Amino acid sequence: MAVTNALCPAKPTKHTPNQGAIIVALLLLLAGGCQWAASSQNTTGAQLYEQGQYSAALQQFQQVVATDPENADGYYNLAATNHRLGNQRRDPNLLAQAESLYNQCLDHQPNHVECHRGLAVLLVDTGRPDRAFDLMKNWAAQNPNYADPLVELARLYEEAGKSDVAKKYLEDAVQRDAGNSRAWLALGNLREQNGDLEQAMRNYQQSLAINNMQPEVSERVAMLSRQISANYESAVAAGQTQIATQPNFQSGTMTR
């Protein structure tokens, strides 16, 4: 049974000390119950969304924000579902609703990565790419030690066909936070697309060293390793290998 608003904590009123302690304990229990219910509803809604049952998913996500009005994921999920339906139906009202919900999500959680991404995509979808780039740049400026804004900004540039600019932002991202597995993964993916397979594999390995719960990245590393070995064997067979330079030499020029 869904948890209703009546079970969610409200602002406590003044009580005697003993009553206050009891009320605080009850409020903590109720808050935990609301958060658990919201999490369950988000999970159910996400499953319905993946199955293409968008109307049913919307109902679940609406229950999330009714149960827990501070739940940023609930607003994001509502926004993403309205966004999908708005694009499918070419309905500007649904897209406007999605934009409002994305902004509500960010009001509750200013560094919500998926919400920034979703809002940026919506702005591009509705003919406002400059606003999308401004959104990400402002987010990055407000969080100078946070790599995710740069990762998402790079993603926008890559989608706009500016891979060189995207690469710069991703290199900045791993400098900003060398412990961000998403940044290393994105940099590896871009380098793989550009044909720099050895460097891409190193970037993937760095991402895995930070977060080893990425089976798809492990598969990419294994595939690239095989491809690099095959390329080397082909080069040897074609007589294209080069003699390594001696120490203190660079391209045949002696250093001092």
What residue spans do the PLM features occupy?
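Sec-dependent bacterial lipoprotein signal peptides
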Residues: 1-34
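Helix-start (N-cap) detector for alpha-helical repeat units in TPR-like alpha-solenoids
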Residues: 38-39, 72-73, 113-114, 147-148, ...
